[in-house]
Amino acid sequence: MTKTEEKPFGKLRSFLWPIHTHELKKVLPMFLMFFCITFNYTVLRDTKDTLIVGAPGSGAEAIPFIKFWLVVPCAIIFMLIYAKLSNILSKQALFYAVGTPFLIFFALFPTVIYPLRDVLHPTEFADRLQAILPPGLLGLVAILRNWTFAAFYVLAELWGSVMLSLMFWGFANEITKIHEAKRFYALFGIGANISLLASGRAIVWASKLRASVSEGVDPWGISLRLLMAMTIVSGLVLMASYWWINKNVLTDPRFYNPEEMQKGKKGAKPKMNMKDSFLYLARSPYILLLALLVIAYGICINLIEVTWKSQLKLQYPNMNDYSEFMGNFSFWTGVVSVLIMLFVGGNVIRKFGWLTGALVTPVMVLLTGIVFFALVIFRNQASGLVAMFGTTPLMLAVVVGAIQNILSKSTKYALFDSTKEMAYIPLDQEQKVKGKAAIDVVAARFGKSGGALIQQGLLVICGSIGAMTPYLAVILLFIIAIWLVSATKLNKLFLAQSALKEQEVAQEDSAPASS
């Protein structure tokens, strides 16, 4: 096999485009796959929120119930089905078998299911149920009342974890060599943010078309068809890119040699069940502190997002207006994320160290969270002051909530994720592999469902999102305090572990010289 000669990159090119010309055959279709998956992820995320929050008899209070009672069980059921299919089908057939049902559902939803919603939804039964049950269970009744929208929400939520985390990264890690990954994966991160810009603009365009719709036609129905048409086209491009890679890249020995790839892998990641994960976390203070960071982020974002979306519905009760705002929100998340990743992320960690990088996200969530909750809780008292800015307390709460979300997510992508991955570096191979598996099973799941569970409990006790907001603010402060303490303690362990590893490396280097 002749190896293509690779010249070293210049400083500017190594920063902007660290790809050799002959590698374009591999990296461009992978980039396109990643772009399509993340484009769909944004369109589906914003659409599912619009459907559930804007549905009749529903609101943001339905989200915690859907996440806990529908998304988590469906994710478990999917993994069981996936495990069975992976033993029967080839890897290529498995990819199509997993992706196709999503696209079929997203094609049927705007053309068949949504137009028949009045027939399919048990509105009268839900009304009777709502009259009997306490106000805190309105979210649970809303799921039944709009069950087809809830089904859309579940599949949209699963798209991210299934197609991105499982199918794409599983495929990419299998076919990408370590020296390629160091260069390719950073580009995929930029691709994700470019897709945010594209999908954000697309959502705004589709949502604004209501102005040209004739009277008597449901404008959101038209927007929904356009959004899902874009999702289907993007999904088909994704499938075509995957097919092309299998046909043209994986048959080229320059890019893929199964035997060589197997040698390069340092052992498979152990599959840990929930019990094993808990035991491993309990035995390792280092991994436990790292898990607390992940759990704290998941809970904090969840607590603020649902309250923000409830304010958003009050400001934009019309589905098209709500969707247009979410499109703009996604667009600006992409813009800010790119700027922070390029000019802030790496520089903060390099100049100020791991701890500063790890503390930026919780401090950002704390400061913006305090301002947001203050505007929601003290809305009436602040109306005179807010009027000086030419707006209303509600609109200001919506804008501050959007800024809070954008900054929190941008710093998460640029700094939180980087410091989290850096924390694994000083660990030995077993700790790295088992620790990552434990955090994937426990921390990721607890972060998402923990916030939903807290909100469900408060909704049942308080009766509405407005009534529970002061308690949410107190819980947020408590969780952030745990986050800050955990990061500070982990920093001490990280520095000690790093020094120990450097000492071991220095001893290994000096051993041949002294002998």
From Swiss-Prot:
Top-level taxonomic group: Bacteria
Keywords, alphabetical: ATP-binding, Cell membrane, Membrane, Nucleotide-binding, Transmembrane, Transmembrane helix, Transport
Main location: membrane
Gene Ontology CC, one term: plasma membrane
Keyword Transport recorded: yes
Cysteine pairings via disulfide bonds: none
InterPro entries listed in its UniProt record: ADP_ATP_car_bac_type (IPR004667), MFS_trans_sf (IPR036259)
An MF annotation (GO) of this entry: ATP:ADP antiporter activity
Membrane topology summary: Multi-pass membrane protein
Transmembrane residue ranges: 24-44, 62-82, 93-113, 124-144, 149-169, 184-204, 226-246, 286-306, 329-349, 358-378, 383-403, 465-485
Entry's family note: Belongs to the ADP/ATP translocase tlc family.
NCBIfam families in the cross-refs: AAA
The protein's name in its UniProt record: ADP,ATP carrier protein 1
Underlying gene: tlcA
